[in-house]
Amino acid sequence: MNADKKIAIIIINWKKYDLTLNCIDSVLKSSYKNFKIILIDNEVQNSFPDEINKSEQIKIIKNENNEGFSKANNQGIKYSIKHGVDYVLLLNNDTLIKNDLIDSLIQQSSTLNQKIIQPLILNYDGSKIWNAGGKINNFFGTFQTLEKGKGFKYFKRNRTYTDWFTGCCVLIKVEIFNHVGYFDERFFAYYEDVDYSIRLKKMGYSIALMTNSYLQHYESASSKSLNKIEGNLSPYVHYLNIRNHILLLKKHSKSFNLIGVLLYQLIKILSYLIYFLIRFRFNKFKMVLKGLVDAINFKK
């Protein structure tokens, strides 16, 4: 029986308590009830209301520092495995799930004997696709999000597998972690999901895409810049994106074409530097350079 499967739902909070509470509320309304929320709180100063702290369906793991996405998820995964769950569902705190989402994921996993499944992800108002799977370009070393920005009503549900999953929402059978390992904590945040996807594929696993249910997502709400002069994303996010993309390519260098990778990275980084320079976004300019230097100095 699918209802017998015990699920750990790992949610990481950092700064956006209101979004986290809304996400938890949507999970608690789920038609599937055999779950426990593992809430990893990377925010030091604030605290959750009593109804969250005292809930038997929620376990809060409080960190003294912001441990990032990779390490915080690993904390939740290890706790979950220790407590005998069958599946782990990674879920961003800036999402709202449909009440049948978990049921649908478990059903597809059981029916297809599929161990890793990502659902369809829409933007917050549900009008457009945010993520319908991903495509890896092995020549240039790029990772495309498929169908992003396309109207939901025009979406054709004809794809069943994806090259890489997004850590925004993915269901993983716990046996996978025993075989493949945990997220690489050197990434901190960004590209750790692509890295894990590549490792999965190297070990012979496929990643399914489920499109008969979905969730809605605020994009990168917790990592947006608070400084309007610097634009939407913070300088640190640009640092991580530059550094981690190159780290990933170095880590899996045999999977990509060296000439294509160098050409793409040269154009990409120069474009960022020129754009930030002429827009007087000097903090971002410096962080892109720092990301490049740190990635070059990184040893596999």
Q: Can you say where each PLM-predicted feature lies in the sequence?
A:
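Short, flexible, basic/aromatic active-site loop/helix in glycosyltransferases
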Residues: N137-D163
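Conserved donor NDP-sugar-binding/catalytic core segment of glycosyltransferases
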Residues: T95-N131, K135-N138
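Short beta-strand-to-loop acidic/aromatic patch adjacent to the donor-nucleotide binding site
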Residues: V85-L96
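Glycine-rich, basic loop-to-helix element that forms the pyrophosphate-binding segment
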Residues: N63-H83
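Non-catalytic, C-terminal membrane-associated alpha-helical segments of glycosyltransferases
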Residues: Y236, K254-K300
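Short beta-strand/loop segment that forms part of the nucleotide-sugar
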Residues: F35-E43, I61-N63
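Short, acidic, metal-binding catalytic loop of nucleotide-sugar glycosyltransferases
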Residues: D25-N34
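A short, conserved alpha-helix in the catalytic core of glycosyltransferases
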Residues: D163-I172, I176-Q216
